[in-house]
């Protein structure tokens, strides 16, 4: 079952996300991929797959991904954020992670959780249907 996945990474985490994406290219190519600007360009180049690119995170890209979550257009977020280097758009990062919690969206913030998400039989076989809160 094809899903829409957002892939986002802070500058110091971009190489890690690219390595992870290359390891999981066979699974990623089955899905619609969206990303913030710079990360999306790097992913397109490395994977040779189509990636819908939004603005760079500090220029509103995190908020654009957040809008997809609120509109029910995203199935999971893989967000390798950097907890050791503060970013000028940290409030946007917090808002994005908050939306994942509000809308019960699966989110992976490191390679361990991303591995578990992308290799889960529930995810791969489309057996998991997340409960979307009604407000």
Swiss-Prot record:
<dbReference type="InterPro" id="IPR018148">
    <property type="entry name" value="Methylglyoxal_synth_AS"/>
</dbReference>
<comment type="similarity">
    <text>Belongs to the methylglyoxal synthase family.</text>
</comment>
<dbReference type="InterPro" id="IPR011607">
    <property type="entry name" value="MGS-like_dom"/>
</dbReference>
<feature type="binding site">
    <location>
        <begin position="56"/>
        <end position="57"/>
    </location>
    <ligand>
        <name>substrate</name>
    </ligand>
</feature>
<dbReference type="InterPro" id="IPR004363">
    <property type="entry name" value="Methylgl_synth"/>
</dbReference>
<feature type="active site" description="Proton donor/acceptor">
    <location>
        <position position="62"/>
    </location>
</feature>
<dbReference type="Pfam" id="PF02142">
    <property type="entry name" value="MGS"/>
</dbReference>
<dbReference type="GO" id="GO:0019242">
    <property type="term" value="P:methylglyoxal biosynthetic process"/>
</dbReference>
<comment type="function">
    <text>Catalyzes the formation of methylglyoxal from dihydroxyacetone phosphate.</text>
</comment>
<feature type="binding site">
    <location>
        <position position="10"/>
    </location>
    <ligand>
        <name>substrate</name>
    </ligand>
</feature>
<feature type="domain" description="MGS-like">
    <location>
        <begin position="1"/>
        <end position="135"/>
    </location>
</feature>
<dbReference type="GO" id="GO:0008929">
    <property type="term" value="F:methylglyoxal synthase activity"/>
</dbReference>
<feature type="binding site">
    <location>
        <position position="89"/>
    </location>
    <ligand>
        <name>substrate</name>
    </ligand>
</feature>
<protein>
    <recommendedName>
        <fullName>Methylglyoxal synthase</fullName>
        <ecNumber>4.2.3.3</ecNumber>
    </recommendedName>
</protein>
<feature type="binding site">
    <location>
        <position position="14"/>
    </location>
    <ligand>
        <name>substrate</name>
    </ligand>
</feature>
<dbReference type="InterPro" id="IPR036914">
    <property type="entry name" value="MGS-like_dom_sf"/>
</dbReference>
<feature type="binding site">
    <location>
        <begin position="36"/>
        <end position="39"/>
    </location>
    <ligand>
        <name>substrate</name>
    </ligand>
</feature>
<keyword id="KW-0456">Lyase</keyword>
<dbReference type="GO" id="GO:0005829">
    <property type="term" value="C:cytosol"/>
</dbReference>
